């Protein structure tokens, strides 16, 4: 894991699980606990792909979520292949309780990134983002699983990041107010030919 130029960085250990009843009791389009709710179902994922179904919900949140009415995206529990990297934007809560996402073997993309790949935004452009839950399985690939840059008020909680090779499980830089809560980082492999910085952990 790597962190550079982050203000108010906090790592917290908790033991209580996140409540999941809201996911199953709240229909799509309802407002619950201050969030507009979107449910990504197994049938949607089966008819397209995990990437297409989840990213469609995140794109809807990008277009419509506000600080006054943020969006919460629930993904049905299950094990899914992630064929492309997800993008998440401001005022969005992504709930992945009971979800395992596995990157395609030999692929080259971040599993999830704040903002777009060609972003030129600076400062704390993206705000109020939560990634809650999920097993993020890098499947032995060598690209960072989660990348978080130029954000304010972001939380990563109840997640497991694992199984990357010669790379970071997570990179964070240029942020203000990050909470990492009840997360596990595991199975990061380093080959003898890899450069040392691919295995470092820096917080500063």
What does each of the following model-derived ranges do?
Residues 1-4:
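Sec-dependent signal peptide cleavage junction
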Residues 9-56:
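Right-handed parallel beta-helix/beta-solenoid
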Residues 12-15, 41, 76, 83, ...:
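A structural detector for beta-sheet-dominated domains
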Residues 45-51, 67-109, 136, 141, ...:
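N-terminal extracellular ligand-recognition/capping segment immediately after the signal peptide
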Residues 54-66, 81-91, 104, 119-124, ...:
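Short, T/G/N/S-enriched strand-turn elements that build extracellular solenoid repeat scaffolds
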Residues 68, 101-103, 109-138, 146:
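N-terminal adaptor/linker regions at the entrance to substrate-recognition repeat cores
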Residues 82-85, 103-109, 136-145, 164-172, ...:
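Short glycine/acidic-rich loop motifs that flank beta-strands on beta-rich extracellular proteins
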Residues 93, 97-100, 124-138, 152-163, ...:
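Right-handed parallel beta-helix
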């Amino acid at each position: 894991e790597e962190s550079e130029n982050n203000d108010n960085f906090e790592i917290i250990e908790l033991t209580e699980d996140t409540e999941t009843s809201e996911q199953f009791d709240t229909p799509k389009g309802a407002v619950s606990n201050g969030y507009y709710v979107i449910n990504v179902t197994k049938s949607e994922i089966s008819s397209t792909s995990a990437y297409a179904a989840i990213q469609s919900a995140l794109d809807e949140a990008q277009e419509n979520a506000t600080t006054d009415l943020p969006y919460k995206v629930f993904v049905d529990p299950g094990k899914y292949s992630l064929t492309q990297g997800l993008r998440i934007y401001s005022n969005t809560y992504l709930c992945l309780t009971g979800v395992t996402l596995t990157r395609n073997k030999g692929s080259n993309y971040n599993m999830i990134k704040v903002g777009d790949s060609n972003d030129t935004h600076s400062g704390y452009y993206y705000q109020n983002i939560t990634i809650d839950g999920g097993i993020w399985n890098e499947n032995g690939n060598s690209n960072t699983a989660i990348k978080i840059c130029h954000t304010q008020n972001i939380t990563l909680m109840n997640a497991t990041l694992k199984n990357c090779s010669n790379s970071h499980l997570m990179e964070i830089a240029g942020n203000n107010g990050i909470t990492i809560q009840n997360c596990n980082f595991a199975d990061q492999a380093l080959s003898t030919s890899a450069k040392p910085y691919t295995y470092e952990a820096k917080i500063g």
